[in-house]
Amino acid sequence: DRIVEKPVVKKQEAFRLASISFAYASAKPAKKQDIVFENIVEYLKQNPSARIRLDGYADKATGKARTNLMLSIRRTDSVRNILIERYGIAPSRIEAQGIGSNAQPYEDNDLNRVVIVTALPE
């Protein structure tokens, strides 16, 4: 009798891939974000079955909750459109959701004007 070990396949976990910053009240990515987009695209090219999730936020110190939610949705739409239109990423590989200002990923208020890009498990 021969014993054959089967390799253990570890399931990939979701991880933060990137953060894309925005100016106050803007849905247009802040200046100098091209390298961030290029890194996201490079990851997606190297991992052809990979998918990402875009979580949009707005800072809590300004605007009403509903206004901030709509702004966060516009931010994720902006990032999604750039990835699709400029870089040719398939829409089916991108999930997007606006979270608004109900959750704040960073302690520094200004940093919460952001879309966080998460690589999803394959």
For each of these PLM feature ranges, what is it?
Residues 1-51, 92, 110, 120-122:
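Periplasmic peptidoglycan-binding/tethering modules of Gram-negative envelope proteins
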Residues 28-34, 57-122:
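Periplasmic OmpA-like peptidoglycan-binding domain that tethers envelope proteins to the cell wall
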Residues 54:
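Conserved phosphate/oxyanion-binding catalytic-loop motifs
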